[in-house]
Amino acid sequence: MIYLALWGLCLGLTAVCWRLGGVPERRAAGMMLAAYALSVLLGGVRIEGLKVAVVTADVLLASGFLWLAMTWRRWWLLFAAANALLVVIAHISVFLEPSIHQRAYIAYRMLPGLAIPLAAGLGAWERWLAGERTPGGWLRRSAS
């Protein structure tokens, strides 16, 4: 039950990024949605207790956030990139020391993993509070 609530929170914050955010927020939302989809659809394959798709998604997400943080001047991108790197470090530590208990591994990944969409949502909200216009809508509007 808690797991579903956390997934709902992450998806809701991703939707906030898409709806209220600018270009970097929307790119981050797209990257997070792609990482969620990869983790869910291909999450069953394991090597040494690690889910290969989850590790791959987290490494790609960290790389994407590092790229966004170096490209755009937004405070939340640095915070999200740092937390994404912490998630990757969690994967590396479990790979190097397989005796780490599974619940400790999940807890080690959970807090930084939840901080990523939270930071993105706060960044989009801050942009909205500042009165900045969002880029073009989801669908093109008719010229009538």
Features from the language model and the residues they span:
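N-terminal signal-anchor transmembrane alpha-helix
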Residues: 1-44
